[in-house]
């Protein structure tokens, strides 16, 4: 479909985003977790979702591996495919924000331009970039899926941090030390959400 096909029109919903947020009791927002493989993105995002669920917050977690089983199963790991992967996830996340959910996304998303693209799509005030900053040496030592070992052996191409660049955020809303305890990181995130009046519980 062409982007500006004149036969395709946008239909407004009778229920507004604000009405949905009022129903949920909190604002809709995306927490975009970014960092190297093994940095702890998925672990921290999952722990935060669990904490938010216990507080009665309506959430959904989009995980990098999971979306490649369906939504992005046709994509590889070239720069072009990575960009399309993030574009699709950004669109899904935006729809969920419009539904009034707190959306957590855990993706390496190595390029600043793609993260900025999603920020602009979702809109300022509804996009929180979470940089899980863990040194490459620590990520490689963890290597939960054995991917660094494969990349070092030349068995895995385009692996971020080894033969594909990772562009660290320059002004993330929150910068987490990935070597800290997960419980500490979750508390920092909850504090941020409360300070920004996204959740009140």
Swiss-Prot record:
Active site: residue positions: 109 (phosphoserine intermediate)
Signal peptide as annotated in the record: none
Provide any one GO MF term from the record. ATP binding
* Domain of life according to the entry: Bacteria
Question: Which biological process annotations from GO are given for this protein?
Answer: hydrogen sulfide biosynthetic process; sulfate assimilation
Q: What class of enzyme is it?
A: transferase
Q: Which Pfam families match?
A: APS_kinase (PF01583)
Name of this chain's protein: Adenylyl-sulfate kinase
Q: Which organism is it from?
A: Escherichia coli (strain ATCC 8739 / DSM 1576 / NBRC 3972 / NCIMB 8545 / WDCM 00012 / Crooks)
């Amino acid at each position: 479909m062409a982007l500006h096909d004149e036969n395709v029109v946008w239909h407004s919903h009778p229920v507004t985003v604000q009405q949905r947020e009022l129903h949920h009791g909190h604002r809709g927002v995306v927490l975009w977790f970014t960092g190297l493989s093994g940095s702890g993105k998925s672990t921290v995002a999952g722990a935060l979702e669990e904490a938010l669920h216990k507080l009665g917050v309506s959430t959904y977690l989009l995980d990098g591996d999971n979306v490649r089983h369906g939504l992005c199963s046709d994509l590889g790991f070239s720069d072009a495919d990575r960009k399309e992967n993030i574009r699709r996830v950004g669109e899904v996340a935006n729809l969920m924000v419009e539904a009034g959910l707190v959306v957590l996304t855990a993706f390496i998303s190595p390029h600043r331009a793609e993260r900025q693209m999603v920020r602009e799509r979702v809109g300022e005030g509804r996009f929180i970039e979470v940089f899980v900053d863990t040194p490459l040496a620590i990520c490689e030592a963890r290597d939960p899926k054995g991917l660094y070992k494969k990349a070092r052996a030349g068995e895995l191409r385009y692996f971020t941090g080894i033969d594909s660049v990772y562009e660290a955020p320059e002004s993330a809303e929150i910068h987490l030390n990935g070597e800290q305890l997960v419980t500490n990181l979750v508390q920092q995130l909850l504090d941020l959400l409360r300070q920004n009046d996204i959740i009140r519980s």
